[in-house]
Amino acid sequence: MAVSWLRRLAAHAPAAVFLAEGARAGPVRETLAVAHGIQLVDSPRHASILLIVGNVSNGWHDDLRRVYDQLPAPFASVWCRSEPFEALSNPTRIDDIAALPQGLIDTQRELMLGQRASALRLLPDEPPNPWEGLGDDGHGGEGMMGGNPYGRPMAMNMQDDLRDGLTLDTLTFRLGPFHPALPPGLQAEISLQGDLVQSWSVTRPPFASVIDPVFLAARQAPVSIAALELTRARHHLHRLYRGLCIAGWPTLAERTLHFAGKLGPDSDIAGLRRSLERSGLWRLALPAPGRGEVDKAQARELGGPAARAAGIEEDLRCQDANYRRLGFVPTCQQAGDTAARWWQWLNEIEQSLSLARQAIRLDLKTAESAFIETPHGPWDSSCPHDKSDLLSDLLPGLEWGEAMLTLASLDVAGLDPHPLEDTRLTSTFQAGREVGT
């Protein structure tokens, strides 16, 4: 069968990949975002490949099947460090992160050229709720009393408005656990009135974040302060990258990610900071001052950068003699709102780079191993724990965009103290995606 010119054209397009992150996935999103020939998309309906990375236990399989069946044909699934569904015949599995980009590119090319058959659907072709022949008019609705018209729940104005007294219909839905704007694993039941978050209830907490190996090593023996601080700065840059993606600033997001990939003790964040300030991000995209604010008790529970953004000068590095030799003093904001937490990332990145340069010059290692200040918060007698229960208090009353950017500024996942091997790619697949830093 002849291959049409349209198929040949599609075969050479970047591989459109929707990433479903399971437990212990690691920074695969950041890795693939700079890989040449890969395009990460925000919806499974825009993808030709579903990439599942990390452990997805049985309790999440139904959610993953729903994502799987949303991809338009022809499509395929690729499993990385994850067990494929038993119902799949000859699933593609790639556990080597370095081989993942080329494997995705080859899969897309085979699909588009007709060399690989499209994957089969896993779920029956049925509406989410039965509706045919139900209700007064046979479409599932119950007049003005709700029901499920054509299988979809009808919005109802059953709750008072939180903002201006205008009672709009309330739409309740469930989001997660594989939505790219949420921490991996987080699932919530949300009620919206217009674009206002009326309620937010966490139904499943996020998967625990995986600790970088250098922080685990620091709990066992003295390690280079420069290595710790460069890793801390890179972590904050990755958080900033994800936040910029959610805010809809892809060019600055990609620039931030490339800066993180090239990060070294001589790196200077001044140019990136200047671009962020001049772009109008704080004025045009981030919530207004006071929005997403945490009180002192919430800030202490969150710990780490979120606490320091609320004016709490708590940082375990202050208790390390060699950090004190470097003149370390916590950098803090005072407002404790969403914008303050974004500023805190930038200030801590700049501080970490300065500490790394000084530590290299003095050849300093950590003096304490009984505790460590991780990028997620303090790790002393226990790891940072899950704090997603705070979201039910913090997010209601915010507009949808404000809520997503507030959530992006909060590190609510617990910490998994067992590190992964390095998941960053070599330069082979980063070629062709360079931008100015």
Predicted regions and their residues:
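Primarily hydrophobic membrane-targeting regions of prokaryotic envelope proteins
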Residues: 50-51, 195
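Structural motif
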Residues: 18-23, 48-49, 52-56, 76, 80-82
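Metal/cofactor-centered catalytic core regions of large enzymes
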Residues: 97-437
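N-terminal, charge-rich interaction modules
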Residues: 1-35
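Glycine-rich, highly charged phosphate/nucleotide-binding loops
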Residues: 34-38, 62
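Short acidic low-complexity segments
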Residues: 37-47
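FMN-binding flavodoxin-like domain, especially the glycine-rich phosphate-binding loop
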Residues: 5-9, 60-135
